[in-house]
Amino acid sequence: MAFGLETGPDTVVNIKVIGVGGGGNNVVNRMVRSGTKGVDFVAVNTDKQALNVSSANYKIQIGEKLTHGQGAGSDPEVGRKSAEESRNQISKALEDTDMVFITAGMGGGTGTGGAPIVAEIAKEMGILTVAVVTKPFGFEGRRRMQQAEAGIAEMKDKVDSLVIIPNERLKHATDQKITFANAFEIADDVLRQAVQSISDLIRDTGFINLDFADVTAIMKNAGMAHMGVGRAAGKGKAEEAARMAISSPLLETSIEGAKGVLINVTGSMDIGLEEVEQAASLVQAAVHPDALTIFGAQFDETLDDEIRVTVIATGFDKQPGEPLPKMAAAEPAGEGTAAVPGPMPLNEEDVDKSEDTEPDPFDDIFKIFNKRD
């Protein structure tokens, strides 16, 4: 039975996170261990052994007749056929679901080929469908990147909203040494915080309340999406948290030019009106002048001096991989502490070679993050 979020006397919103393939399954396992609440988890894989160690509430072995539980062998076509073979099982797991996050590492077999089929089924069932996928590291090779790009292009046509995390950006997320293991945890945090934030928005009654209809208005049939959560404390915390929410170094998008944006500001009862205005104004300045803006505010006494800003932006004209304009870098708050969120998890099997030698438009943003303690 799905986990229900009460949003009113007669309304329950059911949210699921589905990890497809090895990378997607690993994301689900880490999210379960982190204590993410308000959602149910589903693991989908051709690899029976991987499913046996999954922490998901539901486990679906796809393509049993085709692969005999041995995996897809990095062949997206095998992944696609396996998901097609198991359509009924996937549909069953999605019953009574209102919103689904599909996570997969693009470039391999099961995730690349199977995730678009899972998305297609979800959309056919009328479920708000959001995908958070990763692109391979450069060292994983040209073929894997080509498969990833093809899988992402197919996903874009199957989902309501799509968030892309290029694994290559992980090395820019911090100036500290990143191990191969914790690199994936950093990427997972993008999805975890986005999922937790949305479930909290729907579940918790705020001073200015947001509900599932608001989330749907921004994310339904929206194409590329940006999901970010910024946290900061101390001097200038409102602007710092907002800046981090709109410019995660892990994402392939910024919110510039977005035509739909949901902004939620959370703080203690002591949060000042001026701080709320600063955070909202910074976000508004970056989106399209005529953007549909939905604003919410909540109180959380556990935050003390901290402020949290959640931003979901959609309605971009730019396509995945198209260069983004360079954003102006602002000085970080001297005493603030911030956690960069962002949108999504990673696949440990996904890694490919980036041959792009043009200047990275996020360089200035990376410098801001790397200055922080």
Specify the residue positions occupied by each region the protein language model found:
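Tubulin/FtsZ superfamily GTPase core signature
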Residues: 1-373
